[in-house]
Amino acid sequence: MSDFQKSFSESTSSIKFDEKYIDNSVQPNDIGVAEQWAVKTVADPCVGNLATPVNSGYFTKAFINNLPFYREGISPNFRGLETGAAFGYLLYGPFTMTGPLRNSEFALTAGLLAAIGAVHILTALLVLYNAPGKAPNVQPPDATVNNPPKDLFTRAGWADFTSGFWLGGCGGSVFAWLLVGTLHLDTIMPIIKNIWTAG
């Protein structure tokens, strides 16, 4: 330690700052905006579910809580219908455009049948989740979903969700098939089909 440092360490007088440079509005426990971004435990720290800016932010909570699975005020059957319609509608395109019959005149119908088959497989998985011997797991409230639907996590509620999912999935696939079949896509379809066959 140098002599200069020793003189400061051995001095007993505290360092005085000019009063005009001291901000008295800031307290030692005041962390300001950082408190909004702090990572906190939701309930039990042993669970491992932390409230972060990502999973407890306004946009994330609004988006997740507006999905049909968590939206308040709708029945389990309608939850399944809406979820299944989205799945069926979105499954139709990949099966039609990348399926083995994509270059034939039966591509649209083959895509429809494949999408309905996939919806049947997903419905079978939902039925197995509600298999005898165990009840569906009830989701506890967490940082993202404050009020999970209680009526969905019963045997009857899950069965209603599953039947709605099947009907919505088949209906969504048929709706996509009708849209593609009735729109004038004769000029666009060959271009899209050649993207996957080139090479």
Swiss-Prot record:
**Where are its TM segments located?**
108-128, 165-185
Query: Source organism's superkingdom?
Result: Bacteria
Gene Ontology cellular-component terms for this entry are:
photosystem I reaction center; plasma membrane-derived thylakoid membrane
Give membrane topology per the record. Answer: Multi-pass membrane protein
Indicate whether Phosphoprotein appears among the record's keywords. no
Keywords from the named record: Membrane, Photosynthesis, Photosystem I, Thylakoid, Transmembrane, Transmembrane helix
InterPro entries reported in the protein's UniProt record: PSI_PsaL, PSI_PsaL_sf, PSI_suXI
A Pfam family cross-referenced in the UniProt record is: PsaL
**A GO BP entry:** photosynthesis
Q: Where in the cell is it found?
A: Cellular thylakoid membrane
Q: Which family does it belong to?
A: Belongs to the PsaL family.
This chain belongs to the protein called: Photosystem I reaction center subunit XI
Organismal lineage: Bacteria, Bacillati, Cyanobacteriota, Cyanophyceae, Synechococcales
**Gene that codes for this?**
psaL
